[in-house]
Amino acid sequence: MKILFVSSEIFPFAKSGGLGDVASSLPKALKNYSDITSIMPLYKSIDREKHNIQSTGLVYEFWVNLIQYQFEVFQSGDVLFLDEKSGLFQRDEMYGEYGDNDIRFGVFCYGVLEYIRATEQYFDILHINDWQSALIALLVKEKYKLDSKVVFTIHNLAYQGIFSKKSIERLDLSWDYFTASKIEYHDQINLLKSAIVYSDVFTTVSPTYAKEIQTHQFGCDLEQIIQDNEYKLKGILNGVDYEEFNPSLDANLNKHFDADNLGNKRAIKEDLLNELHLEGVDKPLFVFIGRFTGQKGIDQILESLNTLASSPINIVILGSGEKRYNDWFHALIGLHKNLSITIGYDEALARRIYASSDFLYMPSQYEPCGLNQMIAMKYGAMPIVRPVGGLKDSVADFDGEFSDNKGRGITLENGNAQTFINATYKALHLYLDKSKFNEIIQYNMNVDFSWDEKSKEYLSLFTDLKEGWLPERTIKKFEIPSYYNINTLKTMPVDPNTLYTYWEITTRLLNTHQLSVNQLILKAYVDGIEVDSANIYDRVGNYYFYPEMDFKKVSTKIGFIGAYGTFISILESNVFVAPNAKVIKSDNIIWRNIETDTLNTKRASFMSDTYYEVSDSLSSASILKRKELQKIIKDNQRFGSSKGGI
């Protein structure tokens, strides 16, 4: 199987974030099972001599919007580099706020496909990543008509490649593509959206993030198009390259250790404390390594530091980012004897910090995958995380249920400073129980987050696509036939983390409040607290939310934002109490409430031959087959209540 892996950055040649790490490690792991080549732009910042990058001698030309471009192909090992001769990639920064970024990366996408044409190669799989290479999916399907299957990976949905609609002509595209179902986005073009639409399969970097991006909270205004294409979405947790990140091998350390011999970890910690002018090797060391942005939970850390500075702990912070955060951290330097702050990034220092640390702070507001928590666990540190995205998929609270594919850490239920402080005190208390703490540390060091395992999920997907399998668009099982003569809002659980809601709204109700449909907002509530919301564009429709609702009261409301910015409800759903997640015994049991009013309106067409869990006021939950449910409907029997559920 031949694979072409396309990325705008690949470590160690160029890296701005996690994409660079994945673009290095994943092809390396897949090399054991396939013929894979990686390809990226040849930036000005890349040291050609250091990395032994040599010209292949291949030069080719092509036209885009009546402009001729000339590319030369360079190579280092299994990585190809495309050099555009007019200087599109000879800028001081890889990305930057350049006014022609649409041209820079759009032409790069053309250049990749023209390379395939010039060399007359066939690739079974084209694996493209993030918005910079996203246009390849459209070009493959609409212009080049290649038989290769296209897999698109979203590493961070927040970066979408949004440009003026003038880019349609600048990139030599047809205006036929400028529709809401293709690449149009608020009268602009959205390159990331184009790959969601045109790829054969699109993936994200963790299973939880794949669910989150279908919600208003995490969907970055693309949740609807993602929901529409959910049938071809797969979440695969990133892995770690243990040849690169391993305390028993790391060349950045002057001493080494592993799970069976932790002695040198203390010695490395003592050296680091001396280097950073901190005292107390027996105190727990809490660290943060990363970008200073709101997404990373920096506000939560900053608001907590003055309180934590009086605690018997040491704190080390390494990173840089937004100017306001850089300034705030700079003002804290030297104020507390147990706090060390280094603004900037030094990979060797980062490795020494990982190896010295006892706890890693990672209070991200959202985190598509995250690698730091996996690296930290390998280096004998316990992560303190928000349970979002890949953090939720890789870290479980040590006080919670055991999971053999997750490390053990401490989870933060929200983003306020007191929660962060309490978690730190909880960690301190655990640290004092040396036996228990060391048991957790050794367990974490042995959890396998390697790419050797994770790459097999990609390999399986690629193999299926090569052999002709394609995901099929299906009508969601629980969609209900539409009627326009009533006002109704139904809510029911599909599984412990999936909430289905269906609505019908009459023109009369809209006229009563002098509203149009596009002013309406759907909100989901768990135990009376709003957990998610979405804009509504149809009088009849349905929507899926993904809250945690085990044993909690769940409902939805439809309304609008009033003159003073408050939400005004015009339609409220039934309220149900979600069952215990543990009732699920197999995939053949659907975790779902059949609500009274739904039965009374005799909308049974969405029921299949699977089982449903139903409860009445006289007995505990019972399993009923479809025929029995149909009999209940026919006999107009009632069970439950209009405000209750299972």
Features from the language model and the residues they span:
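Catalytic cores of nucleotide-sugar-dependent glycosyltransferases that transfer UDP/GDP/TDP-activated
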Residues: 1-471
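Serine/threonine-biased, Pro/acidic-interspersed low-complexity stretches characteristic
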Residues: 32-35, 457-460, 464-523, 527-646
